[in-house]
């Protein structure tokens, strides 16, 4: 009985400590936003917050770079806040804190329209403008979407595979997150593009959790599970680098075709080295820049087009080298 009592007390104290740490962290983040709002109100014209899928992701850092450059040009105080690792609950909490901090505008991914709709409604009721970036939240209260047409990007990826290969193809798909809207759209577009090609078969699909190590593990599993695998399609920024890490370790006589996403330095180097065959190009820098400009216009009461696609294309080794400005912006040379 005494042991059970002490276990119960220990569990209660642990719960209290964890709760205090969480609330302290939450309070610190909210304090930062509120302090930033005070600073913005005295030295800047507007205060915007960009909430990425995860802070340290290279792709989102390009979005942030574009947003920061536009913010500097338009006298905007910009904050870059969000989860260290992809977590939809932390993502939602950050948006809620931004609303509580009375910012002027929010830029964020629309990962799940049902979950985001109440928050976007709350923001709009408080006079805060909302722009989704990279991934839309259709049917929510967001005013503008700036980013890739994700279905189309998947479709042209499928067209690239058709154009670049001959004979029977067994494709393994590595996707960032199975439940993410934009990843689903990229997979669907790809499937639709190759559907009429009887020689092309989808062997399987695995999740990378938008990490290089996750992509490597997913690719290795697909290689082990499907002996006939001849091609890979990676739908998120770090998938390409992870896929080639797995194929390099896997003993196979087959020359595996690799189709990747986004012009991160490692991906472009792999394309140049012949380890990756084609890359779907997005424009993350432009997304960030255009999103800030859209918020500025909304703040001025101007009407905005609700869908602002930033374009997508496919590049191959012969399209290299990319110019430095093109690499930063993720655009085709």
Segments from the language model and where they lie:
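Hinge/cleft segment of the Venus flytrap/periplasmic-binding protein
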Residues: 10, 23-30, 34, 286, ...
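Extracytoplasmic "Venus flytrap"
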Residues: 46-65, 70, 74, 79-93, ...
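Short, solvent-exposed amphipathic alpha-helices that sit
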Residues: 59-74, 153-157, 181-200, 214, ...
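Short beta-strand elements in bilobed, periplasmic/extracellular small-molecule ligand-binding domains
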Residues: 71-85, 170-175, 194-213
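Hydrophobic alpha-helical
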Residues: 108-124, 190, 208-268
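Flexible loop/hinge segments that line or gate small-molecule binding clefts
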Residues: 115-152, 264-270
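An alpha-beta-alpha
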Residues: 48, 157-197, 204-205, 295, ...
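Hydrophobic alpha-helical segments within soluble ligand-binding/sensing domains
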Residues: 146-170, 214-216, 267, 283-300
């Amino acid at each position: 009985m005494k042991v059970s009592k002490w276990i119960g007390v220990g569990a209660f104290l642990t719960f209290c400590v964890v709760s205090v740490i969480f609330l302290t962290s939450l309070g610190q983040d909210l304090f930062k936003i509120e302090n930033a709002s005070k600073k913005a109100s005295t030295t800047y014209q507007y205060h915007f917050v960009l909430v990425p899928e995860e802070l340290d992701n290279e792709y989102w850092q390009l979005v942030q770079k574009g947003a920061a450059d536009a913010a500097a040009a338009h006298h905007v105080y910009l904050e870059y806040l969000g989860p260290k690792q992809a977590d939809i609950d932390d993502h939602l909490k950050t948006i809620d804190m931004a609303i509580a901090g009375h910012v002027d505008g929010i830029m964020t991914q629309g990962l799940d329209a049902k979950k985001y709709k109440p928050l976007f409604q709350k923001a709009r009721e408080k006079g805060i403008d909302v722009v989704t970036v990279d991934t839309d939240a259709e049917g929510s209260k967001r005013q503008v979407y700036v980013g890739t047409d994700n279905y189309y990007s998947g479709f042209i990826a499928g067209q690239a595979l058709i154009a670049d290969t001959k004979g029977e193809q067994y494709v393994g798909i590595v996707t960032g997150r199975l439940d993410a809207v934009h990843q689903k759209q990229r997979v669907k577009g790809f499937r639709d593009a190759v559907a009429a090609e009887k020689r092309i078969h989808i062997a399987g699909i695995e999740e990378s959790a938008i990490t290089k190590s996750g992509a490597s593990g997913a690719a290795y599993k697909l290689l082990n599970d499907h002996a006939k695998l001849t091609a890979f399609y990676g739908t998120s920024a770090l998938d390409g680098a992870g896929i080639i890490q797995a194929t390099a370790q896997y003993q196979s006589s087959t020359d595996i075709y690799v189709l990747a996403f986004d012009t991160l330095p490692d991906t472009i180097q792999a394309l140049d080295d012949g380890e990756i065959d084609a890359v779907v190009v997005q424009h993350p820098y432009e997304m960030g820049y255009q999103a800030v400009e859209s918020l500025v216009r909304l703040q001025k009461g101007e009407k905005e087009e609700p869908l602002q696609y930033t374009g997508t294309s496919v590049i191959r080794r012969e399209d290299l080298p990319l110019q430095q400005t093109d690499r930063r912006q993720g655009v085709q040379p």
